[in-house]
Every structure is written in structure tokens, then in C-alpha cells.
Amino acid sequence: MNSDSVYEEIPFEDAMFPIRLLQNKRITPDTPEKEALTWHEQIEILYFHSGSAAVTCGTRKYVTVPGEIYIINPYEIHDVAYYGGTLVFDCIMADPRIYHGAQDEVCEIKYMSQIENRKICFNNKISSSGEPAAIITELLKEYQQKQPAYELKVKSLILNFFAWLSATKSTRSTRKTKF
């Protein structure tokens, strides 16, 4: 893999509900490596179930273990590659349109626009015990079942996950931001 990065356009099934979910994604030793790191506007949440992956986020490199959750921030160059075992994980990609509110609303000003503009970046490796895993598991279930009003449930779970990240100081500020 070279040091160049390539823009990755993320397709969504429904443009009105811009979330993409890849459940039980598998990467094997035979999966071809990407030519370059990629980036996109969407926030990406990776939840690892088995095996291990080599995750690159910007200049940081990680080797995953089952149960871990990783965040790829908007516009962050990244890659996920096979490292060992039977690698199975879920990938959630949420476009900024899914979590934006009204332009002058307090949550939009204090959090959502700050995330999109990279003034707030989440730590890539997230504690995988307890609440974050429960939120992601529920989000995956709601999206898969697609019961009435599932869009509201999924959106609320994404916001709940961001609230957990923000409340537990799972962020790294890229610039000084006053709220």
C-alpha cells in the first residue's frame, strides 16, 4: 500500500436515509489489499466479532481483538486489512445528513457540526464493554429488522452513541472550541 489516499464514494440504498450497514463482513488472507488508504465524509463505526484486523486511521495503526469498536472520523484516511483468524465484523457508515438537526439548534452547534468540520474527532479505539456495545448491537438489530419507525430508532441510537462518546471524553479536539 502506498501513501496516497483515494476518495471513496459511499453508496446508500435510500438517499433520504443515508446510513449503510454491512453486517458480518468478512476479510480473508486472500482478500486483495487496497492500493491506497481511502477517505469519505461519513463517520464509520466498526464492531469486530472474531479474528483480528489491522486498522489504520490516519497515522495510527491498531490490531483488533473480538469485541472492540473502532471509529473512523469523517475525512480520515483509513484502511482495514486482514491480520489473523476468521475475521468477521460489522461496518456502519452514517452520512452527516442522518445526524444533523436544525442549523441553529444547540446540539447541532455544540456537537454535530463540530464533528463534521473535524473540530471534534472521536478516538479511534473505543471501550467495547457495556454501553457502547449495547447501543451498536441494538442499532444493528433495528436496522436489520426494519420494523415500523426503524429509521427513528436507528437515528436515535446513532445520536445516543455520539452522546456516550462525548460524555465519556472519547474525543480528541483538533482545535480549541468554545461551547
Predicted regions located by residue number:
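Residue-level recognition of hydrophobic positions within alpha-helical transmembrane segments
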Residues: 38-40, 138, 156
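Hydrophobic beta-strand core residues of beta-sandwich domains
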Residues: 64, 70-72, 126
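Amphipathic, well-ordered alpha-helical segments in soluble domains
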Residues: 44-47, 131-135, 157, 164
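Generic protein-terminus/edge-of-domain signal
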Residues: 1-68, 108-110, 120
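A hydrophobic/aromatic-rich effector-binding and dimerization subdomain
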Residues: 2-21, 25, 81-141, 167
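Short, Lys/Arg-enriched, Trp-marked, Pro/Gly-tolerant hinge/linker segments that flank
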Residues: 120-128, 143-157, 163-179
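Short beta-strand His + acidic residue motifs that chelate non-heme Fe in jelly-roll/DSBH
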Residues: 55-56, 72, 78-85
